[in-house]
Amino acid sequence: MSSYGGGGGYQRDSYRSRNGGGGGGYGNGNGYSNGGGYGGGGGGGGYGGGGYGGGGYGGGGYGGRGGGAGGAGGDRMSNLGAGLKKQEWDLDSLPKFEKSFYKEHADVAERSQRDVDEFRKKHEMAVQGRNVPRPVETFDEAGFPQYVLSEVKAQGFDRPTAIQSQGWPMALSGRDVVGIAETGSGKTLTYCLPAIVHINAQPLLAPGDGPIVLILAPTRELAVQIQAEISKFGKSSRIRNTCVYGGVPKGPQIRDLSRGVEVCIATPGRLIDMLEAGRTNLRRVTYLVLDEADRMLDMGFEPQIRKIISQIRPDRQTCMWSATWPKEVRQLASDFLNDYIQVNIGSMDLSANHRITQIVEVVSDFEKRDKMIKHLEKIMENRANKCLIFTGTKRIADEITRFLRQDGWPALSIHGDKQQQERDWVLNEFKTGKSPIMVATDVASRGIDVRDITHVLNYDYPNNSEDYVHRIGRTGRAGAKGTAITFFTTDNSKQARDLVTILTEAKQQIDPRLAEMVRYSGGGGHGHGGYGRWGGRGGGRGGGRGRGNHFTASNAAPLGGNRRW
């Protein structure tokens, strides 16, 4: 096998001219044919094992809803990847590839170590590892090629975020990277732009080649948002991409993979399905990204991640991004990253974004609806506001949505039992402000990139303090301020101590009744969850009566006559 070489022959100009026209990302077409009866819905088992309808997609109106998504810890999940062949890697025989592109800008080189230290201190930035490059303070200093730089400036960004300032030199240097930063900090662009540079320095894909860049994400929503960023910034280089995730037909994804894509953004389960079926391979992957690594481990994806990485050459560049740095994530980094360099933005202790005003009210369950309405009346006085309401279960999400709509509020709900087409529609209605109230379960607590959410309302308190921080992190993004309102009941008293710690660190007011709970309950909190949390029964109802419209009952409920917005 001949060497790829490292020379300029594969730089962007030759790549572009040889690639002739192919256009940007393929988009994911939904593959639904006329109408699309979901038929009688399958039973669950395994994550995603709940069938999304036993009947085909053809034929008039949607039939019964498919079975539920099932639990992540079922048998199907543990068997995923059993059919993948163990790879034996001989590095001497593998084609060589380029991964080091960073040249330090003169202005960066001239800064004293004291200037660098002050910049890092100002941005609460800590670095670890051998020979960590200095941070950059402007886009020009990052050293991106002009075709990347022009795309960035066209988006109107002022200057790099903290994670980008330090993360870009690290990723462009070809080193393995760990980045720890809060959601909404600009992590996606931190690895996307170096990925584009990396692709344009590699040989073109040959027929049958898999992707060059693989990005693993925990949820469909996050995967779709990453795809949007890659499509936007990779357009000028004609970089092709596809998004591979469950809950939708495989056909369009298979077609994209068979045509050849430089970037594959995937959730672990569906990617393993594709690998086992021989629809793609990972032999060409030289740039691997694990986004929201902590969330993927929380959801029980560790065995699948390990199986996927076993299919990728060991001298690849790996970038791991996470909002937290628990021991499980540290172990994953130790196992799969070589001589990595790390940047942490903010405190390593669990803490909330200080731009968010946190209001915690101790209430009883029967008070919640009235208090929610009172808050919404105040929030929606400003028609530009958007409110994301979190509930503990899918059933309550639907009940609350139906209640709000009947009361005249333009609310819609999103959770794992809803079909992907409906979820996409709800997200778009919320993003565009047509429906400024969205009710969600924790499926939406990470990865939903709606940057102008002004308020988060925790109707039900989550299972642990990490999920609380990630939920409220949906507001106060990209430098904006936000407000988080949380209903806390005596049933949540074991979480009181952790919550008070977070509120105190962020210098927030504390409800005296909450402080009293800490004193009298001795509440120690539930820790940080664990892998077993997502295990569970498959099943799901399936077989509901068909309706002519595309959406579930809660989102189809008519708005009451007393329009509230």
UniProtKB/Swiss-Prot annotation:
All copies of domain Helicase ATP-binding, residue ranges: 168-343
Transmembrane segments: none
Keyword terms: ATP-binding, Cytoplasm, Helicase, Hydrolase, Nonsense-mediated mRNA decay, Nucleotide-binding, Nucleus, Ribosome biogenesis, RNA-binding, rRNA processing
UniProt-listed GO biological process terms: nuclear-transcribed mRNA catabolic process, nonsense-mediated decay; rRNA processing
Classification via InterPro entries: DEAD/DEAH_box_helicase_dom, Helicase_ATP-bd, Helicase_C-like, P-loop_NTPase, RNA-helicase_DEAD-box_CS, RNA_helicase_DEAD_Q_motif
Its EC number(s): 3.6.4.13
GO CC annotations on file: cytoplasm; nucleus
Residue ranges annotated as motif DEAD box: 291-294
Catalytic activity, reaction form: ATP + H2O = ADP + phosphate + H(+)
Annotated binding of ATP, by residue: A181, E182, T183, G184, S185, G186, K187, T188
Motif interval(s): Q motif: 137-165
Bias (Gly residues) ranges: 1-10, 19-44, 526-546
Domain named Helicase C-terminal: residues: 371-518
Cellular compartment(s): Cytoplasm; Nucleus
Disordered: region residues: 1-44, 526-565
GO molecular function, a single term: RNA helicase activity
Gene3D superfamilies: P-loop containing nucleotide triphosphate hydrolases
Function, in words: ATP-dependent RNA helicase involved nonsense-mediated mRNA decay and ribosome biogenesis through rRNA processing.
UniProt note: domains: The Q motif is unique to and characteristic of the DEAD box family of RNA helicases and controls ATP binding and hydrolysis.
Subunit structure: Associates with polysomes.
Family: Belongs to the DEAD box helicase family. DDX5/DBP2 subfamily.
Protein name as it appears in the record: ATP-dependent RNA helicase dbp2
